[in-house]
Design a protein with these regions (language model features):
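N-terminal accessory regions of S-adenosyl-L-methionine
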Residues: 1-113
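Conserved alpha-helix/loop element of class I SAM-dependent methyltransferases that forms part
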Residues: 110-130
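Structured loop/turn residues at beta-strand edges in well-structured enzyme cores
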Residues: 130, 149-152
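Conserved class I S-adenosyl-L-methionine
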Residues: 130-138
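Conserved SAM-binding loop of SAM-dependent methyltransferases across substrates and taxa
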Residues: 139-150
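Conserved SAM-binding motif I beta-strand of class I
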Residues: 153-157
């Protein structure tokens, strides 16, 4: 993860949690995140950082987090060709959990996180205006679904 991505994420986190019960933990969390993201604990971290660096900065005009297929952006938002975008996404394979559609490109995943969501959602209380901590969040699929269900904050570690 590049420092600019980390800084952008953390600036948004600081702003979102200001005045909340999480505010006292901001400094400790920042130090932990920095230590985690800049360590080389995962064998493919360097490879994935390099793949991330090849992607253009994209700003989705549309996203839908409330459906089984999480959609982020549309093909018309791409600043490179669809073929180039698909080739760059292959740098992150294998895609373990989904389903996702990124800027018009369907990501074929090994596991269906939507099936798990469909099983658990009838058994959880309303997430409206809640702050949710998802321990072991993996790729964030369920965080997106929690936000779409009205969570004020969904934080995955």
């Amino acid at each position: 993860m590049t420092i600019s991505v980390f800084d952008t994420f953390f600036e948004k986190f600081i702003k979102t949690t200001r005045g909340s019960d999480l505010e006292p933990f901001q400094d400790e969390l920042a130090a932990s995140l920095e230590s985690h993201f800049f360590s080389k604990r995962h064998g493919r971290k360097t490879e994935w950082d390099d793949a991330l660096a090849t992607l253009p900065k994209l700003e989705p005009k549309h996203f839908d987090l409330g459906q089984d297929l999480i959609q982020i952006g549309e093909n018309s938002d791409l600043t490179i060709s669809t073929e180039d975008f698909k080739a760059k996404l292959k740098g992150f394979m294998p895609w373990r959990k989904g389903p996702y559609e990124l800027f018009g490109t369907n990501i074929n995943t090994e596991w269906r996180s939507d099936w798990k969501w469909q099983r658990i959602v009838p058994h959880i209380s309303s997430l409206q205006d809640k702050q949710v901590l998802d321990i072991g969040c993996g790729n964030g699929y369920h965080l997106f679904r929690m936000l779409a269900s009205g969570a004020k904050l969904a934080l995955g570690i």
